[in-house]
Amino acid sequence: MTAPPAAPARASVLALLAFLAFVSLGLPDGLLGVAWPSMRGDFGVPLDALGVLAATQTAGYLTASFLSGRLLRVMPIGTVLALSTLAAAAALLGFAAAPAWPALLGFAVLAGLGGGAVDAGLNAYGARHFSARILNWLHACFGVGTTLGPLIVTAVLGAGQGWRWSYVLVGTAQLGLALTFFLTRRRWAGSASAGAAPAPDPARTRDTLRRPVVWLGMLTFFVYTGVEVVAAQWSYSLMTLERGVPPAQAGLAVSLYWGSLMAGRILFGTVAHRVPLVATLRACLVTSVVGALLFWLEPTPSLAVAGLMLIGGALAPVFASLVSLTPGRVGGAHADSAIGFQVAAAGLGGAALTALVGVLSRWGGLEVIGLSVTVLAALLLALYEGFVRVGGEGVGPGQATTGPLGATQVPDRGAG
């Protein structure tokens, strides 16, 4: 049966809206690393309190991500996007107005709830309805946000304004996005193509959690996000406070890191359907270890920055590609919950490992940051190999059919 003519146009509109949602997710992450030295001075907290702030935000993020499977069963994805983006906007404006450290932590919980619902919901939706190409471009849009974030803070500080104005700007933009998602929320209903296989009944949460491949996937995402976030959030402090890099140059270096993530995802999206995915991801993870070594050992300042960019470029396709393979590894009945668990584990890894590196740097000096990134990158490579061994390669040739925007439709492996 031929799909209605409106179906491709609707799918394209939904992809565009998903791209906008991921830009909005990336903006706050890009702000924090550069704004933090100024923020901690205003609130009178030590440098490693960044880990406390990240952990607090992750409490909300984990709650929303872990419960995303249940949330999507009772609330349409369009409504989830509208409400969660509104919550994130309110949190960012709260950051700008926070009079004291406890208030900032409260707004961090709200920011986590909003971001976690958008992240897990769109990843679960995208794994079913978007191709690996679109998923990589989706995560590239996160990179657009994280690349713009440091530039916004650097420009605001360079203009002699306080860091709070950068949060006002981004929070106001997110209010506009929340309105857009509210007005278009009904477009997400019934978006599957006419020829797509019906989704299996979702498995019980405890049945999904009984699968070893789900736990190994969660651990892989935990460490992956640890590498990405530690490199992003601590590199500015290392360069400015330990290595004597001027603030403007260090801010540019962080933007280049996020930019390499964005560019890598855009590039990989154009070739994702033509390369052997497992071998390509393995090569990317090996390259990330090389980049981490350059950043840590700093043969020259330029090579250290190049290493930071190499980490970003090499990690670029990993998250989205692993998400796209999840339905094939765990089965359609387990996919939504498994992806929610993976996103939750990713959020926990970003917060917990950022906090751990902060404590270690306070004890052993800021150069511990480069060593930590290197060790985590090597651990990620080892975990990936274990994930492939236990879970297989996901959907192989001949196992899949095509859905909206080239989405992979996988056979169900059972709900038990």
Predicted regions and their residues:
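C-terminal transmembrane helical hairpin of 12-TM major facilitator-type secondary transporters
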Residues: 275-322
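Extracytoplasmic gate region of multi-pass secondary transporters
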Residues: 32-33, 211-255, 259-263
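Helix-breaking motifs and short loop linkers at transmembrane-helix boundaries and internal kinks
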Residues: 44, 76, 97-99, 244, ...
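Cytoplasmic helix-loop-helix junction between adjacent transmembrane helices
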Residues: 107-142
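Conserved MFS/SLC helix-loop-helix module at the cytosolic interface between two early adjacent transmembrane helices
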Residues: 63-102
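A late C-terminal transmembrane helix in Major Facilitator Superfamily
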Residues: 332-366, 373
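Helix-loop-helix hairpin linking two adjacent transmembrane segments in secondary transporters
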Residues: 138-189
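Helix-to-loop junctions at the C-terminal end of transmembrane segments
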Residues: 64-77, 264-276, 361
